[in-house]
């Protein structure tokens, strides 16, 4: 999760999405509804973000450990339908507010077509997970409501804002 931290993001802070953890010049937001019936645009955006497959990593919540019984309860998120998950690294973070420990997994070498398939499934109404895809340049946060993109380089976000000026969410721009 070191790579996530290089974006200025605290992934473990599940109370605040990554979008609100960075300045407005380093982020762009799309409502997922703009991709309904328009997944070609979604594909173009993902192709722009992730040029080479070998650089893509993902981190997501896989479960939690209750402070009461100290047993892990896994989320049934079905990511294996979209992502090839061989080697993952687990990180546990105590969350005092929820009175449990959140268990995160990080996976390397994600295929960009799998990123697209997952995002497309969310557009089509599939249940979401708290998940991010990232490389050295971009971080993509996906939920049922929004597709948030973060970059360390303001020029990258400017390019996206110019290319998709008619569809990105300008409320927080």
Label each region the model flagged.
Residues 57, 69, 128, 144-146:
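Broad gene-expression machinery/nucleic-acid interaction feature
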């Amino acid at each position: 999760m070191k790579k996530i931290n290089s974006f200025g993001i605290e992934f473990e802070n599940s109370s605040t999405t990554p979008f609100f953890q960075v300045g407005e010049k380093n982020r762009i937001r799309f409502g997922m509804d703009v991709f309904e019936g328009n997944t070609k645009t979604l594909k173009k955006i993902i192709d722009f973000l992730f040029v080479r497959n070998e650089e893509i990593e993902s981190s997501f919540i896989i479960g939690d450990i209750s402070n009461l019984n100290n047993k892990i309860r896994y989320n049934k998120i079905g990511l294996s339908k979209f992502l090839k998950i061989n080697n993952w690294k687990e990180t546990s973070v105590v969350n005092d507010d929820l009175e449990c420990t959140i268990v995160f997994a990080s996976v390397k070498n994600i295929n960009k077509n799998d990123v697209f398939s997952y995002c497309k499934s969310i557009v089509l109404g599939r249940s979401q997970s708290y998940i991010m895809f990232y490389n050295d340049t971009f971080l993509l946060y996906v939920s049922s409501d929004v597709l948030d993109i973060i970059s360390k380089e303001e020029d990258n976000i400017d390019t996206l804002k110019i290319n998709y000026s008619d569809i990105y969410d300008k409320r927080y721009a």
